[in-house]
Amino acid sequence: LSSAQVAALTDAQLRAIETADLAAMATAGLAVLATDSISGFSTRQLGALGSDQWQALTTAQVRALTTAQVAGMATEDAAALTTDQLAALSTEQIVALTTAQWAGLDSADIAALGTDQLQAMETRDLAALDSVDLAALSSTQAAALSAAQWRAVETADFGAISTLALAAVSTDAIAGLSTLQLSALGSDQWGALTSDQLRSLTTAQIAGITTEDLGALTTDRS
């Protein structure tokens, strides 16, 4: 079918298309479908799409996906979305992403997310991010995450956070970190903490600081 022919199909006709036939549809044909048509597909139909077909969808089409459709995406299909497509997801769609889908995203995908999208992430999904993903967080993104979200970050990955991002973490979030998370920080990260962040440390957190890390604190912040 040509793009013009595909665009002329009704929603009922599109829903009747067999999965094997939808998988054979040209990317140009998919890109001309109305957003209502996209949201009318079953998760089974969408599951037949290949990575090139997913990437051919416009940002408006991606944003039209229902939360059930988003949650039903295969992990490889979610990972195939472009950074522009991911950045177009609504906060409701972000919440609908499964932990497995989050784990399949790469650092460029994470770096493309807006602060409202990051704030919508479930804590279990933050825990699914690896060290490379966390290293991609900007200072603006780091500042947007809540104390509960930061507490969910795996200790093994915590040391990957850039010094710029760490310096932007809220004082409430710093005070809520576990001693194990803080123990993963390197001397350069300790040295990047602001005076306000250091003052927010609890007595238990301070007691857990190693002498090496104490030595990394600059005189104007210790």
List PLM regions with ranges.
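General marker for long, soluble alpha-helical cores
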Residues: L1-S222
